[in-house]
From Swiss-Prot:
Coiled-coil ranges (or none): none
Full protein name: ATP-dependent Clp protease adapter protein ClpS
Pfam families linked: ClpS
Lineage: Bacteria, Pseudomonadati, Campylobacterota, Epsilonproteobacteria, Campylobacterales
Domain of life, per lineage: Bacteria
Length: 96
């Protein structure tokens, strides 16, 4: 008699996603913010300029949406680069 096997379907859920948000300040230059957006978030010049203006006019702006691990890594890269350049630029991570 052949053995029968029951296969259970495992339902995989999508991972939670997190927004990386840059916060405007009165010291960090617009050029530095664009550099961050291009180098860390891989935005082209046009998109980086649009995002920078959003941050400047609204006080903050979303730079990208990632899994938690990647979002936290990008936040750390922003803060480290800003400290190295003597800018107070801050980034925060929020669940979407």
């Amino acid at each position: 008699m052949p053995k029968t096997q029951t296969l259970e379907q495992t339902k995989l859920s999508e991972p939670k996603m997190y927004k990386v948000i840059l916060l405007n300040d009165d010291v960090t230059t617009m050029d530095f913010v664009i550099e961050i957006l291009m180098n860390i978030f891989h935005q082209n010049l046009e998109k980086a300029s649009q995002t920078m203006l959003e941050i400047h006019h609204n006080g903050s702006g979303i730079c990208g949406i990632y899994t938690q691990e990647i979002a936290l890594s990008k936040q750390k890269k922003v803060i480290d680069a800003a400290k190295l350049a003597n800018f107070p630029l801050q980034a925060k991570v929020e669940e979407e």
